[in-house]
Amino acid sequence: METGKSDVLDKIEKINKKDSALQEIIPKGYEIEHHQCGIALNQLIPSKKEGEPDKKVFITSTIPQITERFEDIESNEVSFNMLFYDNKTPVNIAVSAEEISDSRQLLKLVNKKLDVTSSTSTKLVDYINASKRYNPPLNVKVATRLGHVKGYFIYPYQEVMKDSNVKLFSNDKGFQKLIDSFRSKGTLQGYSKKVFAQIKDLPMVMVMLYASLGSVLLREFGLQPFIVEISGSTSTGKTFTLNLVSSVWGTSDLITTWSSTQNSIESMASFLNSFPMFKDDTRNTHPKFVTSATYNFSSGESKSRSNINLTLNAKKEWRNILISTGESSIANMADEKAGVSARVVTLQDQPYPDNFDFTTLDKSFRENYGTLGLAFIKQYESKKDVYKNAFESYQRYFNQKGSNEIMQRLGRAFALLQVTGEVLNDIDGFEHDHFKIIEQAYDSMVKNNKTIDKPKQLLEEILQYLDANRNNIVGDGYSSVKNGDIKAIYKRDYLCILGETVKEKLTHELQTITGQWDKKGYLIKGEKDRLQKQVKHQTVKYRGFAIRQEVLKELGFDFSNSYNPNSNY
């Protein structure tokens, strides 16, 4: 495994400047031999006869030294940095304890330039461990992921972590690419004047910016992960916005597409941990995958999986925000719409005004990035108790404001976004009306997102189905059903949707949804306060859910047959 370009290598670079193979103490029974082609490590086998020289057995021409011992502060697992020289060029490899203890594992490092064969691997393992005892490696505490880890906050920025007792360590090339994308250019003042000033009055864009910044606060306020998405038709600036809001932490290389596997999303969420995950364009994968990934991500932990030892792997955990784009909202992709809706803040209004200058703003945030995120964390730390009290106040406000169960469950998410806006507003040069921003975004979501009120949405869907199948309706003004079953009975004061029709549409959610219909006052109930009403038609008694006429009108439906010239209705 190759070490990543993380800050832990700072200490290694000091050793790289020296010929460590000559500096270290060579264990008894070994020697380093210099020759015209380089150097060689030999094992010395004492002669059995007096006067005969000791026998030399060649081991390797790339003499390894274990320079660092890395101890993961979460798992307590130990790994090492192995240093050797290949044609006078230093090579650092991150190796597990198993790889330097098992000759078969060590042999795999031949692909990393280590001079080892099947006949020398056992001897080389013995030398490495003997050398490690003679030359104890430097102990380094490391974290293998970002954000809140065991009482530390692990930054992806090398300059911030240089004085920390814990170093960031990654030997995964994919994660290393993410680490490299967390970098800065320009100044905070430049970002304020050239980027923030252009977007501070755009509610949809600002809420996405709040989500990007506020992700690092989820553990601070005890929130589960959630999703913030901007959805709508093409060419409205969705991907542009994602690039923009990622700039508070680094470059647009932080963004990946939805064309991923469940495992890769879990791994990335766990690695980023507290920092936001950016996913572009839900069209890149199947809707069922998106909804499944949404449920899994918002749980904050990976699925339980067994291993070859028939035990369970340790679960990966995270507390961050997933920021997404797509033409269709994630909630609309789901069969269980209410469950998804309570996990997703959906922004559907036009994010930018007509004739907006995208070109200038694009140039600005590509020349100024990676500064605001650090300033945000610093500002939060300076008044942490004040912001925590503000969060509690905002949470109470949104709980009271929530007009239904979904918006009440999203109240904590909006409270976090609101306090994020407050922290941002307290940074010099980033003053703006954060209350107005959140208020507009909240009201927009209530207005545009029909999946928020699931009972109402499902009733609308059933009514649309009946409207398209009026030949299966009987009652006042209707003729008899000639083909198929009766699905509803129309009366002047209500439309009675037969129980079987509702059961067919609502399946296992029948009791929950019809109970909500009752609470909302949609139903004319039957005898003994039963939800289903008995309705008589042509001497036959039917049972069903009687939807009030005023509710039908409110939802835009007219099931009267007044358009029929032969009808009195």
Give residue ranges: language-model regions:
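Phosphate-sensing "switch" segment of ASCE/P-loop ATPases
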Residues: K316-W318, A334-I427
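AAA+/P-loop NTPase substrate/partner-engagement loops
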Residues: T241-V290
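P-loop NTPase catalytic core of nucleic-acid-dependent motor ATPases
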Residues: N165-T251
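AAA+/SF3 P-loop NTPase mechanochemical coupling elements
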Residues: N307-S324, V340
